[in-house]
Amino acid sequence: MTQYRFMAGVTIKIFAAFHVFNEAVASSQPCAGWSMYPTLDATGDAVLLLPMAYWRPKIWGMSNKRPERGDLVVTTNMNNPAYTVCKRVIGIEGDVVEIEPTRSVDGSKSWAQGRFLRVPKGHIWIVGDNLSNSTDSRDYGPVPIAMVKGKVTHRIWHRGWLDWTTLGPNMSYLGPSPVPPPGSVQPRPL
């Protein structure tokens, strides 16, 4: 009987260690949909998620690290908290972001004036790389940093094959970023 108790204890400890590793150190995360195309495939890629990428214990002499512009992050879905979304950070606290662009992403069309917003403290502004087919901060506003599940560093599964593509801060898919001249527009809340 003690042998079964010992084996049950070891099994529980192994599952607990795996769970802690999966929740705090590294895990795979499926990402499907057109929002992050062409960076991630619409049929579904798996990415490496690092939950501890933005956390450092104070004993190391470092404060909590914040998401930076260009980072790919997984956050809780603002429209349905039971799900997560994978998006790119384009604005951090204090940045002024354009909500309604004054020109198309490829720069071919322009409009009179865009809407701008200053990202509040403790928040980030996230968008999908496929701007024309993404529900993101343009729809639900700034995302609290507390809702960030972790940083995406690599694609590990692509079209049915193992893959190890590094996903860095490449924002070239987002097109040109118009910056308003100083004093021309005042940021206003949503």
Language-model-detected regions and their locations in the chain:
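A structural signal for short, hydrophobic beta-strand segments that form beta-sheets
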Residues: 89, 116, 151-152
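PP2C/PPM family metal-dependent serine/threonine protein phosphatase catalytic domain
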Residues: 100-110
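Protein maturation boundaries and topogenic segments
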Residues: 1-84, 104, 146-147, 151-190
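Acidic loop->beta-strand submotif enriched in PP2C/PPM serine/threonine phosphatases
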Residues: 109-120
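Segments surrounding the PLD/"HKD" phosphodiesterase catalytic module and close analogs
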Residues: 137-147
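Phosphate/adenylate-binding glycine loop and adjacent helical scaffold
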Residues: 128
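A short, structured loop/turn motif at beta-sheet edges
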Residues: 92-95, 118-123, 144-145
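Mid-length scaffold segments of soluble, non-membrane domains
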Residues: 82-99
